[in-house]
Each structure stands twice: as structure tokens, then as C-alpha cells.
């Protein structure tokens, strides 16, 4: 049930990412054409439109959170924790939406460093907040030194609260940099309307809707897979989840190259440099396939060590290694789909 809730979270996550991308691509086109004034206008409209969208998504998520574990066929013993986890996540969807929007806008303006640094910070903060919120006050031993670590002892609630607090801090930093420091997109102190225009929304829908349906299809398939795997028992579910998490070592570089491809191709299209656009498309797709192919080979070889770090249970290890090695063969073609997706957006 917790795994199913995670899949629904990814679906919501994908919807927010798609909504942000619908405006980010338009900004990339305007920047490529040298029209920074229009780029800022689109950004202002994007803030309002995406906040409305994510708020509606949040309300829907909160409304279904109570029944979600039942629909996913989860064990009754963890229904309450699963519902609570998803409900808190849904409540903070507007913050996640602004994070996606600000990060996408900065990347499409050519700034990859700031979003990357802030998202790395978010991961670190997530670990720190979880350390203090999940567990109660306890004695901890690090490198032979024993000390008392304070803790809230909130369990599952602490896990999701740590995540959303990390999101809030990162979103604040991302929006501050975008609105006040970005050379191309800062608009604080400038006059402008935040009311979305019909033409901007129309273009956004044309870009976002296919992406949104794609995310729904992928996450729907993952949820269906979870429902199928669930009757096989906890070992099968855990092995499948650990293998998917380990596989992210491969496809995270692919998503990074995909973001770069969207920026390079979008700005080239805005500048009407079609030959350069095609060169960037070819370079990024082949680079993604090469890198993820190498990463796939590495995780195939290191699968026992990778899964071994994640769980001490021998049954889960054995099954997880098999799953991870099967997934490794798909990485080059998976890379092609990920990066080509960024190109065609």
C-alpha cells in the first residue's frame, strides 16, 4: 500500500512537472529569439496558472487519500499510514509545483547549476529532517562516539514531513533566485500582469497535455504492476521497489541530459537555427544512450553489492539482484526515449 501510494505520488509529481514544462518551453523559445520582455510575461502568467492547477490537484489528492490504500489492495494494517502519507504530500503540492516551475525556467534560460545545487541541497535536507523527525530521541554511535540524538518519533508522518519541509526550503531558494537574481527572468520591482492570457494557456496545454497523459499512462502501469505483484507477498514487493530505486542510478543522468536537450533545442528553435537544433538533438540522444549504456553495464556487474546495501534480507537480495540485472539490458533504449522526449518537447 505504501508502494502504491508512492506510485500515485509520482503521478501527481508528473502532472506538476508537465504543467511547468508547458510554460518553460515557451520561455526557452522567447529567450532564443532574444525577446526577454515576453519571456518574463510568460513567467508571470505561469506562476498563477500552475498554482491554480496544483491547488486543484492537491484538493483531489486529499479527497481520495482515505480510500487510496483500499483501491490499491494494500494490507489493512498500513492503511492509516499510507493515507496520512499521501494526504500530507498532496497538501504541499503547490510548493512542489513552484519548485518544478522555477527549476524549469532557470534551466530553459541556460542556468543548470543553480537548480542542480538546490535540488542536491533538498536531498540532503530530506535526510537530515528525516533523521530528526522519524525516530524518537535515542543513543547513536558514529565512528565509536556515542551521543544522544534528539528526535520527534513521528514515524511515517515524520518521513513525509521531512520531505515536504525540504521541498519548502528548496522552493523558497529557487523562487528567490528566479525572481530576484536571474539575469534573463528576474521581474521583482517591474510592473506586469499575473493574469494568464488565452494564447499562452493554449500553447501551454498543447505542450503539457501529451506530457501529462504520458505520465498518467506510465504511473498507471506502475500502479497496475504493484496491484499484480502485491498478492505475491512482501518479499516480491520489496525486491521490485529496491530494484527500481537502484535503477535510478542509471536513468538520472538520462533525465539530466533530457533537461539540457530541452533547453538547447528550445532556444535553437526560438532563434530559428534549425541545423543547430538537429545537431543538438543528435548529440544529446547519442550521449544519453552511451552514458546510460555504460551505467547499465556497471549496475549489472555491481547488482549484488547495490542491493546488498539496501537490505540485509537474503530472499529480497536474491530476487532484487535478478530484477536489477534484467532492467540493466533496457537502459540504452530507455535513454533514447528519455532524451528524445526532451528534444521533442
Show the residue positions of the predicted features.
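Hydrophobic alpha-helical membrane segments of integral membrane proteins
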Residues: 114-118, 161
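Helix-terminus/linker motif at the lipid-water interface of multi-pass membrane proteins
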Residues: 1, 5, 69-76, 132-136, ...
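Short alpha-helical transmembrane segments in multi-pass integral membrane proteins
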Residues: 27-94, 136, 141-208, 265-330
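Small-residue-rich hydrophobic transmembrane alpha-helices
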Residues: 5-6, 10-59, 99-115, 226, ...
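Glycine/proline-centered helix-kink
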Residues: 100, 127-131, 159, 163, ...
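Transmembrane helical elements of multi-pass membrane transporters/channels
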Residues: 88, 99, 122, 166-170, ...
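Transmembrane alpha-helix boundary and packing residues in multipass membrane permease domains
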Residues: 25, 66-67, 104, 131, ...
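Residue-level hotspots within pore-lining transmembrane alpha-helices
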Residues: 12-16, 56, 60, 90, ...
Amino acid at each position: 500500500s505504501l508502494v502504491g501510494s508512492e506510485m500515485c505520488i509520482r503521478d501527481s509529481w508528473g502532472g506538476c512537472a508537465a504543467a511547468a514544462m508547458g510554460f518553460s518551453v515557451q520561455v526557452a523559445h522567447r529567450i532564443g529569439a532574444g525577446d526577454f520582455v515576453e519571456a518574463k510575461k510568460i513567467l508571470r502568467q505561469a506562476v498563477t496558472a500552475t498554482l491554480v492547477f496544483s491547488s486543484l490537484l492537491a484538493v483531489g489528492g486529499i479527497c481520495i487519500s482515505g480510500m487510496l490504500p483500499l483501491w490499491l489492495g494494500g494490507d489493512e494494517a498500513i492503511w492509516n499510514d499510507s493515507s496520512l502519507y499521501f494526504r500530507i504530500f498532496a497538501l504541499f503540492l503547490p510548493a512542489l509545483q513552484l519548485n518544478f516551475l522555477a527549476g524549469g525556467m532557470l534551466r530553459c534560460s541556460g542556468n543548470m547549476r543553480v537548480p542542480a545545487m538546490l535540488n542536491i541541497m533538498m536531498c540532503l535536507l530530506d535526510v537530515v529532517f528525516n533523521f530528526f523527525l522519524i525516530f524518537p530521541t535515542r543513543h547513536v554511535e558514529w565512528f565509536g562516539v556515542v551521543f544522544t540524538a534528539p528526535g520527534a518519533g513521528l514515524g511515517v508522518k515524520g518521513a513525509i514531513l521531512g520531505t515536504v519541509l525540504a521541498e519548502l526550503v528548496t522552493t523558497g531558494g529557487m523562487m528567490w533566485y528566479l525572481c530576484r537574481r536571474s539575469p534573463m527572468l528576474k521581474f521583482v520591482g517591474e510592473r506586469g500582469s499575473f493574469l494568464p492570457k488565452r494564447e499562452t494557456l493554449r500553447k501551454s496545454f498543447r505542450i503539457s497535455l501529451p506530457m501529462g497523459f504520458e505520465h498518467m499512462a506510465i504511473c498507471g502501469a506502475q500502479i497496475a504492476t504493484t496491484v499484480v505483484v502485491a498478492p505475491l507477498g512482501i518479499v516480491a514487493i520489496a525486491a521490485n521497489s529496491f530494484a527500481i530505486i537502484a535503477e535510478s542510478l542509471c536513468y538520472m543522468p538520462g533525465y539530466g541530459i533530457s533537461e539540457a536537450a530541452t533547453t538547447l533545442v528550445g532556444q535553437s528553435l526560438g532563434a530559428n537555427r534549425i541545423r543547430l537544433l538537429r545537431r543538438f538533438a543528435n548529440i544529446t540522444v547519442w550521449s544519453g544512450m552511451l552514458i546510460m549504456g555504460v551505467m547499465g553495464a556497471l549496475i549489472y556487474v555491481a547488482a549484488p553489492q547495490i542491493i546488498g546495501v539496501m537490505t540485509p534480507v537474503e530472499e529480497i537480495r536474491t530476487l532484487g539482484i535478478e530484477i536489477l540485472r534484467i532492467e540493466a539490458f533496457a537502459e540504452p533504449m530507455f535513454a533514447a526515449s528519455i532524451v528524445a522526449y526532451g528534444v521533442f518537447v
